[in-house]
Amino acid sequence: PSSAASDVYKRQPFSIPHDAANPCGFTINNEKHQLSIATDIGHMTNDIVKHLEGSELLLLESNYDTEVLKCCKYPFHLKARIAGSTGHLSNTMSGKTISYLLKNSNLNTAILGHLSKESNFPELAYQTVVDELLANNCNTDSINLSVASRELPGRLIKL
């Protein structure tokens, strides 16, 4: 991936581990602000984290709950693909990533996105991430955490 500049904004794509052709996430920044979008992530890598560091706002995949995935109606091969290293990011891993960024970066807003309809629920994704934040001694009052709607546009966020 290569970067591109538009006016004062720079868009920097970064590679992600997913079973698709050239998948990528994006970091968008200017001199004052940075945001990142990262979905369809099979597993979190140091390279992805480096791209996310410095972001004030992050839209991060929180695709599935491990226990719900085990019990959902998906066939075994699809469950294995989703939970595999080139599949999707679990709620727990999303929470661990947000915890790290909250402690080591400028993150103040995180939106959980790309939730599965079959193996996740918005309330469960949210609570799992909050539980991870608390387990990692993060101040939950220092982050604006929300879950993106599957069907509707989100609210306007001003940086």
Regions found by a protein language model. Give the residues of each.
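Short, basic/aromatic-enriched C-terminal tail that caps enzymatic domains
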Residues: I143-L159
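Active-site metal-binding loops of divalent metal-dependent hydrolases
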Residues: I16-D19, T39-I41, S62-Y64, L115
